[in-house]
Amino acid sequence: MKKKILLLLFLLIYNNQAYSIETKIIHNIQNEIITNIDIKNEFKYLIALNNSLQELDKEKILGISNESIIREKIKKIELSKNFKEIKLNEDYIDILLKNIYSRLNLKSINEFEMYLNSYDLTLNEIKAKITIDALWNELIIQKYSSKLTVDKDKIKKEILKNNKIQSKEHLLSEIIFEVTKREEIEKKYNEIVKSINQIGFKNSAAIYSFSDTSKIGGDIGWINENSLNNNIKKNINSLKVGEFTKPIILSNGILILKLINTKNSETTIDIENELKKAINYERNRQLNQYSKIYYNKIKKNLDFDG
């Protein structure tokens, strides 16, 4: 069924480039439709966020775009049940937009608009997408914050133990995947490794990772090693730049980390600041896992055609 849908999308989008594309309904989720145009726009959006996707064949990118827009639509349906309106404060939207265009090495919102225009995208379209993502994260916090287990004392002890002038930071990317049985981990990991060797870590993250970072090639940025738990730190410290970890088993997913770069900062550690960052990192990691659990739960209860 999925292959038939992708073939239909490919024919609808790429065999009609010289003409106006006819709008076709591809999915109907709880009376909310997804058309071939929606999927084409998602295609452009994902490539704008992660240029390396262009290295993949178009059918593969369409598959990623199809799954991505389905996730967005399902999230939007659930948000409409929990919020009066799907809207964010403009100041907060500006912060989120800056995070995006800064990662793309753009210096201003005007540069970002020009960049989006080159992909036939508008700023309002991006605002709508990041609003859904941000409100979804807020919903997950509302539902699961009481279930988070962050040992602040343990984290603080680890930071104090490493309170030295030279502080190490790592530039990391991630893939977080899931399996139904523990014995399937190695098989799935080997499948992902094969993909990484063929199409790169970024593109493999877009295909296999259920983390929100999959849209940006798994990029999680610079992380101080004191913000990481001992298990993750141990795995990273065994890597050379460019290498990635063996599967790291988390409570609700399997993590692969790639070491992009490492740097030493000749500064005294700000204990309170590092504690705050470490707590946020661990909290966000757990929330990301609960996000997947909740998404799977609501998806099962929706009427889904296509």
Segments the model singles out, each with a brief description of its role:
Residues 56-306:
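Peptidyl-prolyl cis-trans isomerase
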